[in-house]
């Protein structure tokens, strides 16, 4: 399961993200980098939870900034 989720994030980074032309993530590391690290470090369940929680924070009303994987 973990490998499938990592593959999905990598596919997003390779094919979907470049279509946006301008980087839109307000965080460092980017949300996709964060998701990859969380999945690799914590596995499918907890890594997915952390990634989704981070993506939900990525909106215009959040200040963003440096937010590493715990």
From Swiss-Prot:
InterPro entries, A to Z: Membr_insert_effic_factor_YidD
UniProt KW Cytoplasm keyword: no
Membrane topology: Peripheral membrane protein
GO cellular component, one term: plasma membrane
Annotated keywords: Cell membrane, Membrane
Subcellular location: Cell membrane
Pfam families: YidD (PF01809)
Chief localisation class: membrane
Matches recorded under SMART domains: Haemolytic
Superkingdom of origin: Bacteria
Family to which this protein belongs: Belongs to the UPF0161 family.
Task performed by this protein: Could be involved in insertion of integral membrane proteins into the membrane.
Listed name of the protein: Putative membrane protein insertion efficiency factor
Native species: Lachnoclostridium phytofermentans (strain ATCC 700394 / DSM 18823 / ISDg) (Clostridium phytofermentans)
Taxonomic placement: Bacteria, Bacillati, Bacillota, Clostridia, Lachnospirales
